[in-house]
Amino acid sequence: MKALMVRTDFSLGESALKAENAVKIARDAGYTAVISADSMNIASVIPLQRAAGDDMAVICGVKLNVVDDPTYEHRARLAKESERCMESLVRDRSYCFTALIKNEQGYRDVCELMTLANKREQFYFVPRLALDQLAAAYAKGNIILLTSDIGSVFQRRDFAKIIGTLVTAGGRDNFYSVVYPHPTPFYDQINVRAMKVASALKIEPVAFYPAYYEAVDDADIKDIAHMVTNNIKIDQPHRLRIPHQRDNAVNGRRHLLEALKAFSVRMDVPVTAAMASTTQDTIIEACTWRWHELPPALPKMADDEPATLMKLAVAGLRKRLTTKEFGYTPPASEHRVYVDRLKYEMDTLTRLGFCGYFLMVRDLMNHSRETGIPVGPGRGSSAGSLVAWCIGITNVDPIRHGLLFERFINPERLDLPDADLDFSQARRHEVIEYLNERYGEDYVAGIPNFTYLGAASALRDTARIYGVDAADMAVSKEFKNLEDDSLSLEELREQLASLDKYATKYPEAFKAACKLQSLMRGFGRHAAGMIVAGVPLVERTPVELRGNARCIAFDKRYCEAMGLIKLDVLGLATLDLLDSAKRYIKESTGEDINLDAIPLDDRKVLDGFAAGYTQGVFQLESGPMRKLLKDLGGGIEPMSFKTVVATTALFRPGPIQSGMLDDYVSVAKGFMAPQSLHPVLDELTAETNGVILYQEQTMNATRLLAGFTMAEADGVRKAIGKKDMEKMKSMGEKFVVQAQAGWIDVEMEDGTTQRIHRAEHFKCEDGALRTVEEALEAGVKLPMAAVRVTGSQPGLSETKAKEIWDAFEKNGAYQFNKSHPVAYSLISYQSMWLKTHYPAEFFAAALTILGEDKHQGLVKDALTYGIHVLPPDVNVSSNRIEIRTLEDGSQVLYAPFSAVKGCSENGCQAIMRAREKVGGKFESLEQFEEAVEKRACACNSRVRESLQKVGAFASIEPGSLPATDPERLRDQAELMGNLVIDAVKASRPFEMNPKRSAEVNVLMTRMAAEMGLGDDLIRPSIGIKPKIMVILDNANGNDGRTGYFMENGYDDFKAKLLTAGDLRMGDLYVTGVCKKVKDKEKDYTKDEIGQFTDFMREEINLVRPTYVLTCGSRATSLFNNKSKPSDLVGRKEYLPELDVTVFYGFNPNILYFRPEEGEKLEAILAEVAETISK
């Protein structure tokens, strides 16, 4: 046998060889075995083994880092020793060994070693072992140790002693001294030492020529991968170069033999051909362990898990059938449907061995509810399970909403279930803590994320290390507009002229990006994924450290293959919002609101959706979504819960781009009739206006029209969704054939008749699948009480069957799992119900829970409900929003003390303690000063001054301005940020006298000279009496014709300025950041943008505008670079350092491409007009 030793891209920055490709490359080079030896990582063994087949042996190895004392840094931190002390300690450098797994126990030994190296006490930038830990594992005889290459033990002065320790511990039979015969002085010295040790300790020498990339030309790519991983630029003077590793390509065995012989001659060291042949074979034959899939390992939840689950499910179903949930109790006539579905699901779960999983998830949900942790009604496909509903995992009735169990679990395949669970975002950590306490830390861990370089990230990362201008690098942003995200950079170059231009300008950077695409970029941690195992995790996987969290070594793609079942434990802030609102309601009314009992046909709530009053409502708060809801609210059918569900499923890029959303809205408004392909399909798509929107619709259609089993229907869903052309072809052919078979009328024992598809198969009493006709002929009992066939109906024509299948394929990639939008729309509905019936409590909770970027919109929206948000009041406010009802019955919300800049939680508590100390109310400012703590960490003079400025003391300070007085607005805008929605009225005029105009001209002349713009400079257009400065991102062709911004063109924008903003050109000072028309052949350079920006800041300081309207991301970033410019659109901000109110807009050129954005611009300009006219 011939073995190729490889290091894959799982060794970050050390290899440019993809694990998925390594086996094929080795096979093509004539090898029959691959030895993987990644740095402290064995995850590559799964893709290697899956690619290997039966003709290639994959030996799993790992390069282990060893240091003298891996716990030193941890102990030093605990002892609070200084960094200087740590750095001054004389310590020997780390070194490495490569361990090869011989058998099953050897795999566990390696898992334990790597878990040990990843413990917090030993992890320091990288996982590390102590020599005695390695020796103890080696002594068991289950692994083979090889000396390593870079970082080899032979670089240590005491290498002989170290190797002697290991040989003494485990014997010399499993220890090999390795020669890597690279023709470099470094390796010559290392290899001579390796041969001397082998001779002295009677250790077998062996030779390998490890591969870290495919071809010799790829040596630079490995170097670049290292720079990308370590954030090093290619022209950095001291960047790490590794010349002795520049021939680690995949070479044939002859290359190894020739290199070994050359080493022998060069260094006068005797070698044998056996080192590259029989000794390798001995190692390969000794390593019999191969990675293989493992059975599921779940905690044992009961002695008889199926019986326990059945008992719980039956009890739960009895309760559900007699309890009104979301305004609905299943009628008695449907109870048999629920019972039959429960039996079917339980049979499936029992047969597949998933009962324990359901019990485990139920236990977690029950614990959360019992401890008051808010949980969601469901998420993803698990909402389609009746058993999950019965035992309290979900709160979605799948039969009421037409959801399918098979979308969650395919009864014909052992696909492990994957439940997505929503919990309070604020208390999610308690859920994780419970899992660790309940099952033990050794059984619970997170899941890592393996991130890969896609086309855009490969281009950006290589551009960064090559020092490419940021403006040129921006070409990568165009990739996201393409439908196919699997294209290579070479293929993208053929489609995008801008990328071809980039590749021509930066050929080396582009070539490197092409080579790097799809390589591993880094390791992270899955945001929600958790593993709970029934065996110690170390028996199946190393447990690694990702940040401060423990993770298994294999990502979510491989969990199932390792028999490890994933739970997604997600945090959802809206659950905190709902819980907070309920607590406010309890305080104000004494009511305990049960949001799971509210009816889904509340007309007031549905009218709120139809009017687009969804600011702050889960999933539905964006401007375009609110507009869509208004459109649907004006339709021929009244708004319903089903409409809300469909809207959330449709409002995604796929359905929008494909035209599905437009068709749905057009049918809803009566502009077109729904598409009709067949009465069966018409009935299935009636709830979605004839649009095949849900995957469940396609699954049901294949069963009803072509007799597919639900498991086959799920296969259709998967194949179409993943664009598996081969499966789609075979399933399409089957659909067309079976759809022509037609239906039969079957008489039942009770005298009724059912119409059943002739090709539909049912599980009979003997366990076999048969059609009704086959079962009746064989005399075998069917699951239904069928007596005989009484008639038949013809099937579809071949043409019609093909037409329907084509419709499935066309929309299949954009169809959505109905279970998810149903479950999440329940949360949206609960949010809207609270907002409709308890608006003050809703807004108080929303302002407490949701991010500051949402505050302005919420405060503005609260006003439409007659609710004002007021500054803090020392006699009312606390560390949260407080609700008060005024004498006229209106409600107001008092901001918390912490809403004022500089007032911390300590400050809030200090004021509240002082207020309690004086009887619950301050009578005067003097009493406040006397009672409150004034320590630096509590309520110091600066905090008190800020509180006084915003009006917090107005109620106890006679003669002071009321908190709502407009004179306080400037201070409130400065100190309370987004809770203030009124624009600050200018306290000074916007003066553009002849002197200042002349100064602007001087600045422009200096800019033209310093930047070499000459006549290309585009100057500001200065109105006769400007009221506002309008800042564009850059000049366009219209500006270039006149040499001034906006003197020509911009017709749509000017019309909006006039009609919505009451602004004429004489009222404007129009300028732009980049004062040159962009060259058609190239974008602005990074340096040009920097210079333009600096001059723009100078211009703002010189002109001193009172109001500014930004029209683009560059303009917006001049004033706020903390938020994304797109998130700031429609907001305003007072900047005290400039004494200016900034209204954030967007590039007016968008109006040419998206006229619908005009409504948003009009709203911004109306606010500008209202502010200026005050």
Curated annotation (Swiss-Prot):
It holds the Pfam family HHH_6. It is found in: Cytoplasm. GO terms for molecular function: 3'-5' exonuclease activity; DNA-directed DNA polymerase activity. InterPro entries: DNA_pol3_alpha_NTPase_dom (IPR011708), DNA_pol3_finger (IPR040982), DnaE2/DnaE/PolC (IPR004805), DNAPol_HHH (IPR029460), PHP_dom (IPR004013), Pol/His_phosphatase_N (IPR003141), Uracil-DNA_glycosylase-like_sf (IPR036895). Keywords: Cytoplasm, DNA replication, DNA-directed DNA polymerase, Nucleotidyltransferase, Plasmid, Transferase. It catalyses: DNA(n) + a 2'-deoxyribonucleoside 5'-triphosphate = DNA(n+1) + diphosphate. Its main location: cytoplasm. DNA polymerase III is a complex, multichain enzyme responsible for most of the replicative synthesis in bacteria. This DNA polymerase also exhibits 3' to 5' exonuclease activity. The alpha chain is the DNA polymerase. Belongs to the DNA polymerase type-C family. DnaE subfamily. DNA polymerase III contains a core (composed of alpha, epsilon and theta chains) that associates with a tau subunit. This core dimerizes to form the PolIII' complex. PolIII' associates with the gamma complex (composed of gamma, delta, delta', psi and chi chains) and with the beta chain to form the complete DNA polymerase III complex. This is DNA polymerase III subunit alpha. It comes from Yersinia pestis. The lineage of its organism: Bacteria, Pseudomonadati, Pseudomonadota, Gammaproteobacteria, Enterobacterales.
